[in-house]
Amino acid sequence: MTPRNPSNYDSLFDSSIFSSTLFSSSLYHSAFDCSFGISFTIQPPIEYIVLSKPCFFAITPLLTLRCNGIAWHDSLDMTIWVSTVTSLPISHCLIVSLSLSHAFPSLFYSALVLSCLSLLCLAFTPRIPFHLHSVVCSYFGRECLSPLFPSPYFTCHNG
């Protein structure tokens, strides 16, 4: 994917969601004729991130399990927001949402991934922010959030 001009950064989120694969791996077990794959995507793609702007980017895991020709795959509806501001501690690694309303293999791996990520965040932080909305708005303000978070949950209000 060809990087765009950084001046177009704010307009990238208006029309469609951009993502690129950061990492992909798979395992195969011949006894059960099963394979398990995991990949991580980043939104926006790494080449779009402008480090001088205090915004977030998202890393989303995609899990795939295939047994006897039947495949389950689930993006987990789980997003980890990581700050591009180097001065912020890793405590601002925020798990926004997790959906477990899918097939059992996805349910199992979703819980496993969430547990590992939670432990990772807890290991490197003195505290986890209580209120995501307040923390995000207080640090980053409306200018950054408007293109990134069209959801009403992330609308920053004055005061």
Curated annotation (Swiss-Prot):
Keywords: Membrane, Transmembrane, Transmembrane helix. Its main location: membrane. It is a multi-pass membrane protein. Signal peptide: none annotated. The chain crosses the membrane at residues 22-42, 45-65, 80-100, 104-124. GO terms for cellular component: membrane. It is found in: Membrane. This is Putative uncharacterized transmembrane protein C1235.18. It comes from Schizosaccharomyces pombe (strain 972 / ATCC 24843). The lineage of its organism: Eukaryota, Fungi, Dikarya, Ascomycota, Taphrinomycotina.
